[in-house]
């Protein structure tokens, strides 16, 4: 859903408001409109990452195996082609809250961030459950602790084959790491837009002196979480995965569970890590609450 507010709201303020109060209200409304427009654009950009991520996973899976020494070559390729976020995000990653999302070089940011276990071992992941809905977000005890381990586990599930072209395989592996990192790092500018858009809501949490830092973070995450929107994203990802992995006559099938792994990447890692980045960035803005 688009968040932009009609410009007629501003016209109404100027027509019926009075004096400085109307001017202040008009400025506040204008700031919310601008923040809503930014948020719309950033959400569109977030959605644009879905198809490239899915296609890259499918392309890598379609090669049919893993090359000898592929993991070592991926690290070497990352060293030669380091991922560089924008200057603003790079600066934030050097702060206390942003440092949690840095990765061991040469890995790109956020791919080693450890998400908490929030689901039970036997959680139903992709079917409606009475009283619990569908598509629960988060990690189970048996899931790898971070995205890098998850992608490594997916790679190791492929049979080793000397016929797989190493350069092609490594190129796709590196591209996937860059894509998932870039996708979750969009959480930072999204957080700035959400803070401006819901300034009073977040400042009510940030200025509450009875809450600890961890409690504030938990409340911010609760404020940010929109499970309906998460379900929409995961439903779309599931549909895209099925459509893009359609097999034609005499095609060799994708490795088992390829579609499940795509959904799990978004469900257990991409969505919750993006939310964690948003929450950490908003927590940094307490000094902007007046």
Swiss-Prot record:
EC number(s) on file: 5.4.99.5
Free-text activity regulation comment from the record: Contrary to classical chorismate mutases, CMU1 is not subject to allosteric regulation by tryptophan and tyrosine. Activity is decreased in a non-competitive and allosteric manner by the binding of the host defense kiwellin KWL1 which probably blocks substrate access to the active site of CMU1.
Outcome following mutation: residue 183 to A: Impairs catalytic activity
Claim: Secreted is one of the keywords in the record: yes
Signal sequence annotation: 1-21
Annotated keywords: Allosteric enzyme, Glycoprotein, Host cytoplasm, Isomerase, Secreted, Signal, Virulence
Disruption phenotype: Decreases significantly the amount of tumors produced during host maize infection.
Protein's UniProt keywords contain Signal: yes
GO cellular component, one term: host cell cytosol
Chain residue ranges for the region called KWL1-binding extensive loop region (ELR): 117-140
Gene3D superfamilies per record: Chorismate mutase, AroQ class superfamily, eukaryotic (1.10.590.10)
Known function: Secreted chorismate mutase that is one component of a cocktail of effectors shaping the host metabolome and acting as virulence factors. The enzyme is taken up by plant cells, can spread to neighboring cells where it affects the biosynthesis of the plant immune signal salicylic acid by channelling chorismate into the phenylpropanoid pathway. Interferes with the activity of host cytosolic chorismate mutase CM2 through heterodimerization.
Domain commentary: The extensive loop region (ELR) is specific for fungal secreted chorismate mutases and is required for the interaction with the host defense kiwellin KWL1.
Protein name per the record: Secreted chorismate mutase
Originating species: Mycosarcoma maydis (Corn smut fungus)
Primary gene name: CMU1
């Amino acid at each position: 859903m688009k968040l932009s507010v009609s410009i007629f709201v501003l016209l109404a303020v100027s027509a019926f408001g009075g004096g400085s109060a109307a001017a202040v209200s008009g400025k506040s409304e204008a700031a919310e409109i601008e923040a809503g427009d930014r948020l719309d654009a950033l959400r569109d950009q977030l959605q644009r990452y879905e198809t490239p991520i899915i296609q890259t996973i499918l392309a890598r899976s379609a090669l049919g195996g893993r090359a000898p020494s592929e993991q070592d070559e991926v690290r070497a390729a990352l060293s030669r082609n380091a991922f560089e976020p924008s200057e603003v995000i790079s600066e934030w990653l050097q702060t206390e809250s942003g440092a949690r999302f840095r990765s061991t070089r040469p890995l790109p940011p956020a791919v080693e961030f450890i998400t908490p276990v929030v689901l039970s071992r036997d959680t139903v992941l992709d079917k409606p459950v009475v009283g619990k809905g569908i598509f629960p977000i988060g990690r189970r005890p048996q899931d790898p602790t971070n995205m890098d381990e998850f992608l490594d586990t997916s790679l190791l599930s492929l049979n080793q084959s000397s016929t797989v072209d190493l350069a092609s395989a490594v190129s796709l592996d590196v591209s996937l790491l860059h894509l998932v990192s870039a996708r979750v790092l969009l959480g930072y500018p999204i957080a700035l837009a959400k803070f401006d858009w819901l300034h009073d809501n977040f400042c009510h949490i940030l200025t509450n002196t009875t809450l600890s830092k961890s409690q504030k973070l938990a409340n911010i995450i609760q404020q940010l979480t929109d499970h309906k929107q998460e379900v929409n994203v995961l439903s779309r990802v599931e549909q895209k995965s099925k459509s893009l992995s359609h097999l034609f006559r005499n095609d060799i099938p994708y490795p088992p569970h390829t579609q499940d792994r795509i959904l799990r990447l978004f469900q257990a890692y991409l969505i919750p890590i993006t939310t964690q980045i948003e929450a950490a960035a908003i927590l940094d803005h307490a000094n902007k609450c007046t």
